[in-house]
A protein has these predicted regions:
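Hydrophobic transmembrane helix bundles of membrane-integrated enzymes that assemble
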Residues: 101-103, 123-128
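A generic structural signal for well-ordered alpha-helical segments enriched in polar/charged residues
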Residues: 48, 128-131
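Structured catalytic cores of enzymes that bind and process phosphorylated ligands/cofactors
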Residues: 116-118
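Flexible inter-repeat linkers and adjacent short helices
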Residues: 1-102, 106
Length: 136
């Protein structure tokens, strides 16, 4: 097998969504630690892997939620607001999501509302996140 054939085969091989999920978890750890340079590096790696990943809508929603949190970390506030609006639409289109994704959605929605200085809605979302956390 030539180098080009191996390269083509590697590009056509789908990456298991569990592998990308592991990378997403590493990314979130760096975000929580405020390790900006490592978070940016891992995000770049993930973005290169996503097109080759087996399709998984929950994982794509998780990626978008973490990307929103990443944008808050890197102070890309305008982009984070637009992304969160997209996430709300994406979530509305999905029939169901797992409890962990629901937790992150409510928690990050609370952060979004807090950023907008809508503290009442922020608290409501944080309470929903807390309730969801009990089921995880």
């Amino acid at each position: 097998m030539t180098w080009e054939e191996r390269k083509d085969k590697r590009l056509k091989t789908k990456i298991a969504h569990e592998e990308v999920a592991g990378m997403l978890n590493q990314w979130y750890v760096m975000i929580k630690r405020h390790e900006v340079s490592q978070a940016v590096s891992i995000k770049c790696d993930i973005e290169h892997q996503l097109p080759n990943m087996e399709e998984n809508q929950d994982l794509l929603l998780y990626f978008n939620l973490l990307d929103y949190r990443h944008k808050l970390l890197t102070e890309e506030f305008a982009a984070s607001n637009k992304l969160f609006e997209d996430i709300q639409e994406q979530k509305a289109d999905m029939q169901s999501t797992d409890d962990m994704i629901e937790y992150y959605y409510f928690f990050f929605a609370g952060m979004y509302e807090f950023h907008k200085k809508d503290y009442t809605n922020a608290i409501n979302y944080y309470k929903l996140a807390e309730e969801k956390l009990r089921t995880i």
